[in-house]
């Protein structure tokens, strides 16, 4: 990511960075309005996901996660910013006149050609099922035809490490090793915008535009609001171990549902 550092005497933008190479110019037929329900609230209006709310209005870009334009080559026309995800997106013009958005593969530039199918070259941006061991992939399907569901965030990449029978073994970005069907599609390469974690927003207002509310420590709250709250001055939490706002252990507690149907496909849990 080509970062531009603001050079200004104003404290709010003194250390902010912005990517000048990527702009937003969405196509009307590939976007639609989307109501952001609740923003962290449930149907009763109670907060279920903390630190969410506000944010700028967004138009949803229809992303082609299925890559079902088989054996039809397409050309990358633009690389655009998407407010709904960290990764950038590409506008593809296919040979039959179809236009679609896909996730931007790292290193892809305007003018590159991509294609999806069963017997296509193993090159960056192509979507296929059969590929050699050690291939870096992203946008991986779990169920054939449902579309990519794994490794879709900015900079995400998985690795194909084994094949046996009808199943393939993948190492995911989280460190998890799991099995998927060899009939599932995946896209070759890594998702672009790798340096998203090095981006500096520069001020609190920029984070509010993203729909993220301030995070307050529990130790500075009142006892009625958090188990860590209360005391005189800078008092400790008063417990042996940190807890969540609802009193459960905060560090190391497993939150995955027991006896989940996909447990048999996970060979090693995430780190």
UniProtKB/Swiss-Prot annotation:
Mitochondrion found in the keyword field: no
GO biological processes: mitochondrial translation
Entries under SMART domains matching the protein: Ribosomal_L2, Ribosomal_L2_C
PROSITE patterns: RIBOSOMAL_L2 (PS00467)
Coiled coil: none
Subcellular location: Plastid, Chloroplast
Bilayer-spanning residue ranges: none
An example molecular function term from Gene Ontology annotations: RNA binding
Region of interest called Disordered, as start-end residue ranges on this chain: 1-22, 223-271
Cellular component terms per the entry's GO annotation: chloroplast; mitochondrial large ribosomal subunit
Keywords: Chloroplast, Plastid, Ribonucleoprotein, Ribosomal protein
Pfam families, per the entry: Ribosomal_L2 (PF00181), Ribosomal_L2_C (PF03947)
Predominant subcellular localization, coarse grouping: plastid
Subunit structure: Part of the 50S ribosomal subunit.
Family classification: Belongs to the universal ribosomal protein uL2 family.
Name of this protein: Large ribosomal subunit protein uL2cz/uL2cy
Taxonomy of the source species: Eukaryota, Viridiplantae, Streptophyta, Embryophyta, Tracheophyta
Gene transcribed to yield this protein: rpl2-A
């Amino acid at each position: 990511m080509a970062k531009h550092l603001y050079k200004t005497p104003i404290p709010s933008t003194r250390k902010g960075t912005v990517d000048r190479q990527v702009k937003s110019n969405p196509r009307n037929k590939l976007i639609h309005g989307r109501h952001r329900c609740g923003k962290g609230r449930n149907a009763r209006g109670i907060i279920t996901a903390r630190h969410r709310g506000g944010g700028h209005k967004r138009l949803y870009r229809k992303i082609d996660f299925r890559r079902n334009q088989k054996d039809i080559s397409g050309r990358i026309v633009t690389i655009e910013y998407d407010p709904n995800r960290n990764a950038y997106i590409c506008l593809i013009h296919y040979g039959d006149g179809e236009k679609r958005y896909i996730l931007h593969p790292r290193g892809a530039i305007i003018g590159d050609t991509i294609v999806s199918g069963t017997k296509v070259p193993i090159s960056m941006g192509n979507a296929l099922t059969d590929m050699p061991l050690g291939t870096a992939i992203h946008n991986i399907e779990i169920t054939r035809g449902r579309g990519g569901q794994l490794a879709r965030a900015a900079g995400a990449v998985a690795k194909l490490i084994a094949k046996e029978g009808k199943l393939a073994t993948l190492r995911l970005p989280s460190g998890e090793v799991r099995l998927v069907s060899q009939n599932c599609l995946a896209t070759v390469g890594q998702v672009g915008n790798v340096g998203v974690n090095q981006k500096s927003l520069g001020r609190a207002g920029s984070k509010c535009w993203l729909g993220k509310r301030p995070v307050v420590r529990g130790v500075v709250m009142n006892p009625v609001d958090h188990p860590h709250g209360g005391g005189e001055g800078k008092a400790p939490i008063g417990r042996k171990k940190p807890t969540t706002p609802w009193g459960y252990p905060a560090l190391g507690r497993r939150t995955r549902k027991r006896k989940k149907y996909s447990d048999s496909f996970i060979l090693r849990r995430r780190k």
